[in-house]
Regions:
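A cross-family phosphate/adenosyl-ligand binding-site feature
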Residues: 1-124, 129-166
Length: 166
């Protein structure tokens, strides 16, 4: 698929165990010609985990995209008035971020970017990543599924035998 001249906002929230996959998808999009603009949640910017440091992850993503990324509410807000994204992706999207998005809470750069982008009637693609909270998050996921211009990457419960209530 040729994504030349396509501007993709790529929101990254704090599902740290999926960051290696996230990097690969961002790399793939850039190889297909897309101009990817990373948008980092505050947790992504500040939490060092067993999966790596925030600084290293952000540097890798910025190196792949050639873009310094969006890191503040003030940097995210102009996405709406300027309308420069063709599509926005939130991957990974935590249950917490999905709940906030479903309830119009815009207190992180990713959520502000999503709200600003949605006002232009362009697609928002969500790759949910809630680990054990999929069932508890489904009320909010359902609200988002019923929202025009929001699309979901197919998802499933990660381990239904060992975690039947997740």
């Amino acid at each position: 698929m040729d994504l030349s001249n396509r501007n993709i906002g790529y929101g990254i929230t704090g599902s740290f165990c999926t960051f290696a996959k996230t990097r690969k998808e961002i790399q793939r999009l850039t190889e297909m010609g897309a101009h990817v603009i990373p948008i980092f949640s505050y947790q992504t910017q500040n939490c060092d985990t067993r999966f790596g440091t925030a600084k290293e992850f952000m540097e890798e993503v910025c190196d792949i995209t050639g873009n310094p990324g969006i890191r503040t509410l003030q940097e995210a807000e102009p996405i709406g008035p300027k309308g420069y994204l063709d599509v926005m992706v939130i991957a990974p999207c935590t249950g917490n971020s999905a709940a906030k998005l479903a309830n119009a809470i815009t207190d992180t750069p990713v959520l502000m970017a999503a709200k600003a982008h949605m006002r232009n009637g362009k697609p928002l693609v969500i790759a949910i990543s809630t680990n054990d909270a999929l069932g508890a998050s489904f009320k909010n996921i359902g609200m988002l599924m019923n929202t025009k211009h929001i699309y979901f990457v197919p998802f499933a419960q990660d381990n239904y035998e060992k975690k039947p209530n997740s």
